[in-house]
């Protein structure tokens, strides 16, 4: 990865003190929460410390920076750190998506671990599918009313057609009467499909939460039907 990414993008990874980490649980549910990433330039990987929970080895890290929004998809290599509750994970990048200036209307650059650069944002990996929407009605939590006001944006995580988690920071707003969270963007290059999703509203000095539910399209707009709201897990 070090040899393929431009210097200014490597600097984003090096200076970032927070990233949003996405895993997939045994039911195919993506879960995203903020943590402290540790970019290891010499090894070409990103280290994180997470709770000791069984998850898919396909993971993602989203870095939100003024220069660019950078999504790193990779494989997790756990390492026992002698703790009963936590493990260290080395994330080896497979693909890196870059939205310059966090512009969701612009085609992202796609860098692949196997070649220097892929100009198109089209992912060539075979499709393996993902869990379908759970179905059922919305479960509204008063914390959702902060979406669009105290939390004008949030990280939307879902599983792409290749089976890897995908995440992007998007503008959001709550529609209490409809029991929905509206995604006020259709990010170019993001392979969004109906299915299970997780929305994380969390930022410095703003107590956050994450929302698990069904992602679907309603009259040309992506919406999240919430099923559960919880405090995000913070880890180093």
Report residues per predicted region.
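Binding-site signature for planar aromatic cofactors or substrates
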Residues: 1-236
